[in-house]
């Protein structure tokens, strides 16, 4: 089923011309000639340190891991990727460690926003967000282009202790509430583990559906990199295991049938689905409204393509491009093209969402405030992201990966490049080329102190 949703990939410019080295060694010189996908998301690890020591951290971050990447070096890596991506990056993720502890975090964000970077995602544990009013105001100031990926694993004390090593229930609740009130779009990022919190998946999905400006949830099964290397490779939560749990845990509100594979990457790398709240207050999925077969036809993913004489070639192309735009790593509810995408899909596929169509039209002529409010309460994006480790690594997935981590060629003053996320986390020689790991070898400025 997942493999039915593969779409053609986009070409990229190799970091080193003529790099035909074998995988994964090729990535020590950046993206090679065999890579089949460009960069949808560029992830920059701006510090190796964190104010938590999470037992399941794939990056092995902790308060003892000093290493702060100078702002100029972060920007140099981003600029190198911009040059490879024809001057534009759709999604930049700032990560770590805990990126909000970087003493120049605000400067980095503002300098990034001066570039043609459409959206900035901040991967955070939420501690500073829950406690620092000035920082929250900074995020609110930039809420049109800055979004938070908030670690949110569930609601039980045992869940928090297993994944984060501390009781963070109040902090997580405060962070969600404050971000919602500030109008900052947030994705709840859930690390899900068998026997720990795999029975809380439905509750986290419901929180996303019920909370304004929580744009959705990203469910990530625990994988064996970093401090998770002790995970049992034969007894673990899987991609399809998460899909199977959605229906029973939401009483059928969201099921595996509401998601598809992400067409732009390898079909085993991500499932995605949109939930839309109708004018009657009912949640329906984009897939459920359009239908699986019709959606595949609109995407030109089936042999018998649309042959409806009522649909012109131009309209078919418009709908296809809009749907591919939605079903992409580059898309989220803060993307400036979201109004156009949903208007094209809703009008052309006859979804019966009159208010959504009208406000999408208003947004296209400059009235974005009401459309943002509608998106905040009536459109949610659910993704399942099963990252690979050494037990599950597939070369074909690496070659089609579109989530790339900024790296350098073995030294802080070396050439800037990038490599696929899963390879960077799993293979020690490549992990050592992350900007934050290279910065650990140097004298670094002190981090901000924000404790749980």
Positions of the model-derived regions?
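Short alpha-helical segments and helix-capping/turn motifs at coil-helix boundaries
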Residues: 27-28, 41, 133-134, 201-204, ...
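Radical SAM/AdoMet-radical enzyme domain recognition
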Residues: 75-94, 102-221
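Short, solvent-exposed loop/turn segments at secondary-structure junctions
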Residues: 51, 155, 193-195, 224, ...
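Conserved alpha-helical substructure of the radical SAM core
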Residues: 2-131
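Radical SAM enzyme core and accessory elements
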Residues: 1-32, 279-452
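Short loop/turn segments at strand-loop or loop-helix junctions that form parts
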Residues: 46, 58-59, 150-155, 220-222, ...
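Radical SAM enzyme [4Fe-4S]-AdoMet core and its adjacent flexible, acidic
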Residues: 163-170, 180-374
